[in-house]
Amino acid sequence: MYQDANSKFNKGGFYLARGLFNEKKVAVLEKEFDRVVDQIKKSGENINARWGSRLTERIESSDSSVIHTHNVQGYSHQMLKMIQDKQLLDVTESLIGGNIILHHTKLFLKPPKKGSAFPLHQDWSYFPTKKNSMIAAV
């Protein structure tokens, strides 16, 4: 099903796996996303990952926000099932090989009209890998 994934990934630097999750599964994950956001909002922790730098001060308001947490699978069994999904793992294997290791998961929510800017940036220096084998599954 994803035989051309590796060649497209190597040529363009990305691969869009259309139809990986059906509408019913996406609806479940959307509901879980909202539930996790509600849960972390109630935690009292600072969950605003607003960039807040000179790069963004001219393009966003001072009350902008982007709600953020790590390790989403710890908040939700549905999210855990998603990252363990056989089809997702098969696509991942076709891109980087069979020795797949989960580095981390993240959740971001930008509120309408005041979502924080998040400039393009490169994280490789924080997470160096051999043969550029770290990918993001979004």
Write out the residue ranges for each language-model feature.
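Non-heme Fe(II)-dependent double-stranded beta-helix
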Residues: 1-12, 18-120, 126-129
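Short, conserved beta-strand element in jelly-roll/cupin
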Residues: 128-138
